[in-house]
Amino acid sequence: MGSHSTGLEETLGVLPSWLFCKMLRFLKRPLVVTVDINLNLVALTGLGLLTRLWQLSYPRAVVFDEVYYGQYISFYMKRIFFLDDSGPPFGHMLLALGGWLGGFDGNFLWNRIGAEYSSNVPIWSLRLLPALAGALSVPMAYQIVLELHFSHGAAIGAALLMLIENALITQSRLMLLESILIFFNLLAVLSYLKFFNSQTHSPFSVHWWLWLLLTGVSCSCAVGIKYMGIFTYLLVLGIAAVHAWNLIGDQTLSNMRVLSHLLARIVALLVVPVFLYLLFFYVHLMLLYRSGPHDQIMSSAFQASLEGGLARITQGQPLEVAFGSQVTLKSVSGKPLPCWLHSHKNTYPMIYENGRGSSHQQQVTCYPFKDINNWWIVKDPGRHQLVVNNPPRPVRHGDIVQLVHGMTTRLLNTHDVAAPLSPHSQEVSCYIDYNISMPAQNLWKLDIVNRESNRDTWKTILSEVRFVHVNTSAILKLSGAHLPDWGFRQLEVVGEKLSPGYHESMVWNVEEHRYGKSHEQKERELELHSPTQLDISRNLSFMARFSELQWKMLTLKNEDLEHQYSSTPLEWLTLDTNIAYWLHPRTSAQIHLLGNIVIWTSASLATVVYTLLFFWYLLRRRRSICDLPEDAWSRWVLAGALCTGGWALNYLPFFLMERVLFLYHYLPALTFQILLLPIVLQHASDHLCRSQLQRNVFSALVVAWYSSACHVSNMLRPLTYGDTSLSPGELRALRWKDSWDILIRK
């Protein structure tokens, strides 16, 4: 034990002297820190921040679509559920993050464009993230052109065009999503190029993995902001697929190495984006747990998962529907309006407006509001009782039931009489015995559409059911047509015989449910008026809520097909349209989404020139005439695939869309054209100008062209920032096209 102690003491005694000697040798050498700073990048970043952050809080008023995004931010602040069909929730959450960082409490009435912001609205913070995204897009354009192996001059040219383009400046200075979408589009392209360029010298290195994963993350973020982001995602996937195909044919790589490359790309470019996309919705639904104004669009099960609203009404209802249950039946379709199966004492007219006759039976409709007349009693046809047995007898798939209207005690009926507005379908009514030769036909077979087995029980909220008429095989269906005044403009319900296949308009679910106990009608009416009071919670899984929300977002159609400032894709190319975003309430200061016409026209021309040159070179190479060296040709093809392909994918799909379109939808496509423009100019200088004199003349023309673009940008500055009040004459002078709508006070 003593010898061990002595050895330890000797070691401790030597250690400090050893460290001391090391420190002396270290201090004798100069301490050198090498920092590699790209001053071009620093300067472009600074200029981008200056142009986007300058007087960012101005105007202190709601500008154009801020009226919509502001509402969504307020919903996030108050944790209220909402549905926006324009895109996934990631972009909205980023805007809400700005509000949260600024301490916004969500209390502001977003009711009109031009409304002055109150003092509690942190407008600088709310507009900060779009402005930062717009500013950082400038240096990213520079880096993308460099990664394509073009010159610093071409890279600076692309960045300067992004810097001075008026429409990009305007869109990034407001609480809007396009600048954030463009940022992630460019980040996805830049990350993939850096990954691709590191492929040859350092595959599977830390940097290689970093850029590959960042590509997938950026693509997912772009799609998560707006569905338009999927166009750039497809662009990256397409180019990555071509490169992967080339890897498969590389004989220098082993089979295991090729498999590793393919798996890495599948994980980073497919698995990671899908995971992140689901994560965006998970966070979105976790934040928005309270009932809100858009609940009615969702299913009863979804509504019941939200705090308040339907959850407050339906909490703890009996799960299994039994004979004698009192229920409300909601149409699963929700189109054209969410509504419930309904009846009232009024009857169908004897003769309709078109001269057809009716059965004069009690009307059955679908009513878009909660009402006492929405309640029905599920009756066993073999028994007279309208109460639930003890123990309850659950209704199962395939059972025959009768539906008794709770307030009038008449049974749901259909027969071979044409419906009032859908003559090819049967009329649905509640049967009144007029003592004539029209027997009751009130038996319905229960068909549980989402059953797991043929003995499934009918469940509250969860089961989606169809009612098949026993006598005629017609299916109870919401036609969606609005009845005339005699039907109080309620929605028509019919018996569908011609197309009995599955359709949401034929599917119903129980929303409110109680076990009936009252034998007398007056007591039963009081029971129908009273709320349910049981205490069992009901939850919906995340994947079920995600699937429903995603489906609603994709299928929900905005009824606004016209707008004062809507435009067509053809008008975007030539900048024949603009959007008046804001007008000062007292002066002529105004903000417009209006592009730099020199840049837009030149960018379109560059796309045409590139396409013609590409096919010219391709035809000549087919004849074994190589105008370009192999490395220059590879650069030319990759640049075109990214820039021209990015423009086409972000532009051409709009010709197929049946929705209201605006000029700002073109901005993502425009950024790809802007990247292509200096590439075409450098190519012309390097490969088309044969002599030094031609190059000098061409360079002078390029400088003059850049100067004209800067001059136009400066002339349009008052309409870009809206901080200058111009006279009517000055405003007319800025109306360079008759189609531009410049606001002039009279």
Curated annotation (Swiss-Prot):
EC number: 2.4.1.109
Keywords of this entry: Endoplasmic reticulum, Glycoprotein, Glycosyltransferase, Membrane, Repeat, Transferase, Transmembrane, Transmembrane helix
Entry keyword Glycosyltransferase: yes
Location relative to the cell: Endoplasmic reticulum membrane
Residue intervals of the MIR domain: 318-381, 392-449, 453-513
Summary of the knockout phenotype: Mice suffer of developmental arrest around 7.5 dpc and die between 7.5 dpc and 9.5 dpc. Defects are observed in the formation of Reichert's membrane that are probably due to abnormal glycosylation and maturation of dystroglycan and impaired recruitment of laminin.
UniProt protein name: Protein O-mannosyl-transferase 1
Originating organism: Mus musculus (Mouse)
